[in-house]
């Protein structure tokens, strides 16, 4: 009991020191790693880009922090990844949200501007944010693009959240679409590519195999290989008794692969096809 009271008193002292001197726990000797969660202030800390930049894990650094979508995390326990020489060291001391999706780890790419990311990319970025929230200590917020000087969300953050919501809806739509048109299996060689269908292709278990077809995305020239049910009524009319027993083959978004037998469950494609 006395030990618990002593810890509570120490934590309270740390909070008072922070409020008087405006210092984070990691800057108070002996406290930063003793009670990191117990002593964490509910409102969090507001940091500028300049303040965050000194938490890069380098010589004389105060620790290892990074930010994603304006939220700051202490990633010290992952120092082998985020510290100097680590595979993710370029994320330390900054908000490089865009680079998580683009893979551009140059100075130009390690930025927090996410306005050009697609809804699905933003959804994946949000998954990264959730990962840090679940695995690392939240320090506070980074003022600038996503939070103002008072810690309130900016229009940029509101816009980002709207795009994430669109991404979530697209993901749900894609999951439903995949049930009707599961992705093909595929493998590559130096000269060709093989696509084929099975009762578990695309990770979608079903009682039919189907045949490979190109499925185009509305309004674009892009397509993906899907497996199409080639018997019974179309999916849009499952109870129809008046059909030509072609399943979903007549869907207008589908096209046959050239030089492939349309009845086969597999197809060899030249690279670039």
Curated annotation (Swiss-Prot):
InterPro entries: Cyt_B5-like_heme/steroid-bd (IPR001199), Cyt_B5-like_heme/steroid_sf (IPR036400), MAPR/NEUFC/NENF-like (IPR050577)
Pfam families cross-referenced by the UniProt entry: Cyt-b5
SMART domains: Cyt-b5
Keyword line: Neurogenesis, Secreted, Signal
Residues annotated as signal peptide: 1-22
GO annotation, cellular component aspect: extracellular region
GO terms for biological process, alphabetical: nervous system development
Source superkingdom: Eukaryota
Main location: secreted
Subcellular location: Secreted
Domain Cytochrome b5 heme-binding: 44-143
Function: Heme-binding protein which promotes neuronal but not astrocyte differentiation.
Similarity field: Belongs to the cytochrome b5 family. MAPR subfamily.
Cited PANTHER family: MEMBRANE-ASSOCIATED PROGESTERONE RECEPTOR COMPONENT-RELATED, NEUFERRICIN
Domain-related comment: The cytochrome b5 heme-binding domain was proven to bind heme, although it lacks the conserved iron-binding His residues at position 82 and 124.
Name of the protein: Neuferricin
Gene name, Swiss-Prot/TrEMBL: cyb5d2
